[in-house]
C-alpha cells in the first residue's frame, strides 16, 4: 500500500499577486465588453502606494484605466483607515500600455495553415505547452488539496467582507495537506491559515492573546463552514492546525510585499497536482493560447473523467505561433483508463476541435464579458480558474461532451 501526503495552497483576493491578476483581468473585461475583438496583454505591478499597468493593447474601446484600477483595489478592501500603505483612493496609478506588435498580430489574424475554414484563420498567439487535468476526488473533478485550500481562502475573505470577523484585513494564504493511500485521499493531515489582521483584536494587543483568539475564530467561522459538506472532514484532534505561525500578520498586502500578474499559476490551476506549461492566464485575451488552450485542456480532461473513460486524466496540448492546429495532443490516464492512452488521445483528436478559433467560438470567450454585464475574467482571477461551480464557466460544462464520449 502506498501512503503519502500531498499539499496545495491558495491565497485570498488581497494577496499582492492576486491584486495584480484581478486588475489585469478587469482591464481585459473592460476592453472586451466594448470591443470583443480587442487584443490584450496586460501586466500589473503593485507596491507600497503604487499600482502600474503595462503591456500591449489593440482595441477600439475607450476605458478610464485609472478609475477602473482604483475601483478594483477598493472592492478588494484596500481603502480607508485600514488600507495601510496601499489605499485605492490615494495610491499612484501609472498606465503604460502600448499597441500589439504587428509581427505577432499578422500570425494571429491569419494562420499559416488556413485552408478555407474560417476557424483556420485564427492562429495561436504564441508557441507553448498547456496542461489540463481532472480526477474523481471531488464532485467538481478537482484534486482535493487545492479544492480545500480554495474553500478556506474564499471563506476567509467572506467573513472579512461580511463583518463576521471585523479584525481581518485583505491579505491571506491557506494551505492544506491531504493523506493519500493508494492514490485516494483518506485524511486531512494539516491546515495552515495565515491572515492579515489589525494591530488590536477584541481589545487585546498582546501577540499571544491575539493569536489564540484568531486561531479559535478561524476554526469556527472558516474551517468548519468551508468543510461542512465534505465526507472527509478535518478535526481538532486528528488534524494539525496552524494559524499565523510567525505570531502576527499586521503589515501585509502591497505594503508588505510587491505583487505581479502571473505569479500564482499553480494556485490558479491544480495546486501542483498536475503539470503546468508555465503560461499565466490573467490579462490575456482569448487569442493567447496560454489561457484559452489551458481552458480547453481542462474541458477535455474533465470530459474524459466525467464520461467514465478515466479516473484521472492529464491532457497536454502544444501550439506554434500563427498556426491554428495543435502541434501535439497527449492524454495520460495514470493507469485509470478503461482504454489505452493512445485510444484516449485518438478520441480527443476525433471529438474535440482544439484550434484557437474553435475554442474561442465554442466557449464564447470574446463575448463573455459583454454577456455577463461587463465582468467575467476578473471573477476567475482569485480562487482558481477550474472547478468553480459558482461562476458558470463554459469549460466546466462537460455534460454533453461526456455523453458524446460514452457513445463513441
UniProtKB/Swiss-Prot annotation:
Gene Ontology MF annotations: ATP binding; magnesium ion binding; methionine adenosyltransferase activity
Quaternary structure and partners: Homotetramer; dimer of dimers.
Stated name of the protein: S-adenosylmethionine synthase
Pathway stated in the Swiss-Prot or TrEMBL entry: Amino-acid biosynthesis; S-adenosyl-L-methionine biosynthesis; S-adenosyl-L-methionine from L-methionine: step 1/1
Source organism: Synechococcus sp. (strain CC9902)
Superkingdom assignment: Bacteria
CDD domains for the chain: S-AdoMet_synt
Co-factor note (free text): Binds 2 divalent ions per subunit.
Residues that, per the record, bind L-methionine: 56, 100, 257, 288
Location of region: Flexible loop: 100-110
UniProt-listed InterPro entries: ADOMET_SYNTHASE_CS, S-AdoMet_synt_C, S-AdoMet_synt_central, S-AdoMet_synt_N, S-AdoMet_synthetase, S-AdoMet_synthetase_sfam
GO biological process: one-carbon metabolic process; S-adenosylmethionine biosynthetic process
Listed GO CC annotations: cytoplasm
Catalysis: reaction(s): L-methionine + ATP + H2O = S-adenosyl-L-methionine + phosphate + diphosphate
Subcellular localization(s) per the UniProt record: Cytoplasm
Binding residue positions for Mg(2+): 17
Keyword terms of this UniProt record: ATP-binding, Cytoplasm, Magnesium, Metal-binding, Nucleotide-binding, One-carbon metabolism, Potassium, Transferase
Gene: metK
